[in-house]
Amino acid sequence: VVEGYGIIYNDAIMQKYFALDGAKAASMDEINNFAKLKEVVEDMQAKKDELGIEGVFASTSLTPGEDWRWQTHLANIPVYYEFKDKGITDTDNLEFTYSDNFKNIFDLYINNSCTAPGLLGSKSVDDSMAEFALGQAAMVQNGNWGWSQINGVDGNTVKAEDVKFLPIYTGVEGEENQGLCTGTENFFCINKEASAEDQAASIAFVEWL
């Protein structure tokens, strides 16, 4: 199964922001790179009371076992760009040349959250999705499976038509043309130590699936 993920946003809250005097953008179409995203997010955070939110981003869940959005999904972005620059698809030595870009978006999440940075270690993904569903936050990083989480929250205030996606911008040159992240994290593997007959049967089974 191929997954897609990015920054989920509540369009109702965004439209409310765009209508404010002095808004840093007039529509989501203008938010097509990190610089503009940062400008808008920081302005929204400053005007959170007017928008009726507790913070722009839902909690960056850092409870042990709940950090997969950052150590896998978000980390895929700098790794992708490093691989792209080197023309490779695998490596034994990751240089993390786009670490500053990773830090850009991670800091934006943490510093413009509905939860104080020092408390993020106590937050789970469920907490994060509940904050978004209850209208406490305007944005949350998650994937195309997110609606079931949002809709499953008791008291959900977000309409299905207001759940929309924005690419995860990090400040990489040319990111205006970047789309949502897509990929798969799980693979079937065949043991090379198995007999040739068993390997062939396994391949046939996977192809049948």
Q: Which residues does each predicted region cover?
A:
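A structural signal for short loop-to-beta-strand junctions that line the ligand-binding cleft
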Residues: 1-14, 174-181
